[in-house]
Amino acid sequence: MNRTFLVIFLFHISLASVACLPLINVESQPIVSEIPTATNTPIPTKVWFPPTATYTPLPASSRLITPTIETNTNYSSKIFSDNFTDPKNWELGTFADGIIAIGNNELTLAVKKERGYLFSIREQTNLSDFYAEISARPSICRGEDEYGFLFRYSSPGDFYRFSITCNGQYRIDRLFEGQASSPQPFTISGSIPPGAPSESRIAVIARGKEMQFFINDEHLTSISDPTLGNGNIGVFVRAAGEDDVTVSYSNLDVYEID
């Protein structure tokens, strides 16, 4: 009897000991799965004009600047005039660097991007020897912002460029196979009205390798370069800094020369 009582007593003590043990809280661990990271595929930016930040002067043997050259040229029949009413004649649209549009008898190039560059080439205007003049009217322009006339253009990497700055300078550039050079580097001229608003009449005579350049009926310079013999004509605008640049072109006249 006493032995049975002892066994029952020890059993109850064991149960009480187990009841006093701390509870173990087993939490379920979340399963972490790696989410793949999306890879951004870069969108290529269309290059509308070859970079020409660094200009290399032509070798002395191929460079000829003759400001005193005879500028009396006989013009025969007019090849065409453009009063900028037909949008089919020019490259127009909204581009990465700004807007090109026709309106009010003007072709307007508005650069909206820092150091942006816009240009427009006239369709089906392949010229070799000619006299051309066009009016340029900058409305937003400052400092070394540039605008001007392109000719003998056969590709984005082959043409001549008559460039005017908004602080009264000009230069003549040549791009050949994508490489830029300056037969006539930046030169100050009192014939170029600085700033905006202003207006200038830009003119070019091209006869073979001989080329002459004018602003407002004043002869600026002449160069001799046989590299590019023919091509289309066009206009351009370049922003030198972060500010917008807007230039409108009008009254384009192109003549044959004797």
Report residues per predicted region.
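Short tryptophan-centered beta-strand motifs in secreted/extracellular beta-sheet-rich domains
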Residues: 84, 132-134, 198-213
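Short, aromatic/His-centered strand-loop micro-motif at the edge of beta-sheets
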Residues: 178-201
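Flexible glycan-contacting loops in extracellular carbohydrate-active proteins
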Residues: 223-248
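Extracellular beta-strand elements of beta-rich domains used
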Residues: 84, 250-254
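Short strand-turn-strand beta-turns centered on an Asx-Gly dipeptide
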Residues: 214-218
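Secretory/extracellular carbohydrate-interaction modules
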Residues: 112-176
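Extracellular glycan-recognition surfaces and repeat-rich motifs
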Residues: 87-116
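Ser/Thr-rich, Proline-interspersed low-complexity disordered segments
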Residues: 20-77
